[in-house]
């Protein structure tokens, strides 16, 4: 079966193998995992992975959120058996958190797969994010006014943390379109399932998906390429920021000192963020409040943001604000 499959998918397989080797930012330890839901995207990933240059195992998570999910997981298991790929179904129940069911399901799914990867000696898990996903994410973030880091969108090689579990993710399909992946599945003679939530207008992504579908003149792969350039630019700026931080940030007691002279505003912003994150551990500081904070420091003012007091001057000073006094009733 694998020999026949390899012959059928040879052109796509060459691109796939090259993509994996091209996106690995550090050596791979262990096997490659494949996250498979039964949709066309992940089935194409499974088929390519099965005949790739790498040893693979597959995993499917059944959240129990849809009545047909268990049947879809068994459908994937049958295909894996047919093409000779080890496969495991992980089951769980989802409880909504403050971010909603979809976010809770995503976190739980990745936590389960991280545990599975550790047990199976899987060094990285491949997911089926593709050029259309990348284009949708890029446009969504551009519409929200995201900066360079946000426009970098879906990284091809990244380590995430879910419920305290670390998991390395690889996205080797970012150069493939959704339609090309569906063609791979059909060429190999398989069918796939459809997730109705992909067309749910409740989610912002659905509207951007419809926008792209109604605009065939928009080249998804070109947008994905733009996101890749943003990723490279982000990495370059972070490299410069790390060097400037080592030279310009000093700690004396509980106070951090920053030399702000002759710095581009983007590097200065990132250095201020590093100083504040060092003090509070808060990595979510962004947006207009941070811009106002920096402008006040440039004017030599004393100002507070997110429990950090900043004082402008020749050297900017940062320290944790004293605890607020509780009101006496």
Curated annotation (Swiss-Prot):
Residues that bind ATP: 37-42
Pfam families tied to this protein: ATP_bind_3
GO terms assigned for molecular function: ATP binding; tRNA(Ile)-lysidine synthase activity
GO cellular component: cytoplasm
Reactions this protein catalyses: cytidine(34) in tRNA(Ile2) + L-lysine + ATP = lysidine(34) in tRNA(Ile2) + AMP + diphosphate + H(+)
Top-level enzyme category: ligase
Keywords for the protein's UniProt record, in alphabetical order: ATP-binding, Cytoplasm, Ligase, Nucleotide-binding, tRNA processing
Intracellular or extracellular location(s): Cytoplasm
Top-level taxon in the UniProt lineage: Bacteria
Its job: Ligates lysine onto the cytidine present at position 34 of the AUA codon-specific tRNA(Ile) that contains the anticodon CAU, in an ATP-dependent manner. Cytidine is converted to lysidine, thus changing the amino acid specificity of the tRNA from methionine to isoleucine.
Protein name (record): tRNA(Ile)-lysidine synthase
Organism: Zymomonas mobilis subsp. mobilis (strain ATCC 31821 / ZM4 / CP4)
Primary gene name: tilS
